[in-house]
Amino acid sequence: MKNRKDYLKLLFLISLSVCLMFFINEHYIKADKKNPVISSTEPAVTPKKKTKTSDLPISAQLDVPLLYQFDEPSLYNGCEVTSLAMLIQFYGSTVTKNELADNLVSVPLMDDDGYMGNPNQAFVGDVSGNDSPGLGVYHGPIANLAKEYVGNENVLDSTGSDFTDVMAQVAAGNPVWIITTATFSPVDDFVTWETTTGKIDVTYSMHSVVVTGYDAESIYFNDPYGEKDASMDKKNFIAAFEQMGSQAISLFNN
């Protein structure tokens, strides 16, 4: 009797093992059909459409008016609005950097609860630099400000796109507002701020210029610090542009 019980027990365990092996094998076969790389934990990313370099002219150069952010009334922290004024004036407007600064939404550098301002939401601090320090502002508030002057349909915020798209706009006759760094190359002085919407990394080295041209080796730009068609080698300039989030705005004269 004991041998019979042992035999039945062994038979049961063998049957159970076979069933489990079949189930596991079937499960992974189905999973493999759905996910070609089972071990990957990275989410699927849709590749960005970008302009091919081969589709661009070898070089392009635009004559964009130069504005100096330190012309009185000076804007010590006003590189973003000064660059935007250059962009708008290129299409024939007489808007000034100070008018744009007056109409740009702003927040304190630090609020009463100790939270830092967020440049994605507004200009952080004092754009003039007369009353208090300031950091700057990112593409969102600048694009919204531009729309007030030229209309929604004439503003293209291409933030996140490849730099070849910036070059394509220049080749098409449209200068481009961008965020870069003061050295026009990557920097290592980022700090983390706690804002009301979460933590962000910022650098006081942020800067804004207008891309006016390019050729095989260099990018040309109007610098609101006072230089027209300044140049920088492509590699460093593009690396700084990407480090700052590939922020870019262009306008159309429809």
Positions of predicted regions on the chain:
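Noncatalytic regulatory segments and standalone regulatory/sensor domains
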Residues: 190-196, 200-203, 209-254
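A residue-level signal for beta-strand positions that form part of recognition/binding surfaces
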Residues: 59-61, 175, 208, 218
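Predominantly the structural core of cysteine protease catalytic domains
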Residues: 118-201, 205-208, 251-253
